Amino acid sequence: MSSSIHGINFDNQTVTAKDHGHLFQSVIVDGIMSGCELSFSGTSLVITPGYLLIGGREMKLTANTTVIVSGATTGYARVLITIDLTKAATAELFEQADFQIQYSNTATGFSALNQEQINGTGTGYQFALCTLAMGTSGIASI
């Protein structure tokens, strides 16, 4: 007798990234799980090592990461972590997540985040890590 029930986290069954992500996304909101403290100097935003959960996908920063935010001297910048599942992911190379910067004259003037169902058929997902106030010397505040 065949069954439409398929085990996921059972012995001798395969757990895919989508299966794993689906579980996390249904019970935990996007965000920093630990570490990932933010500081700034001039146009440099520094993020310390830590763990994040974005779109149900767990990722980690293994070293201090510097994001240069130099596209504006007034207004605001929003720092995104963008997931793109069409990019490479191998045991040696991971290119499916990166930082992106958006700029706006107002703190609420940013476009809507792209949050496709990446644990289904979608391939793109954005998470707003922080919003920065910009000044003539670079980042004025987080």
Regions found by a protein language model. Give the residues of each.
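N-terminal "first-domain core" detector
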Residues: 1-52
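Beta-strand-rich solenoidal segments
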Residues: 3-10, 44-142
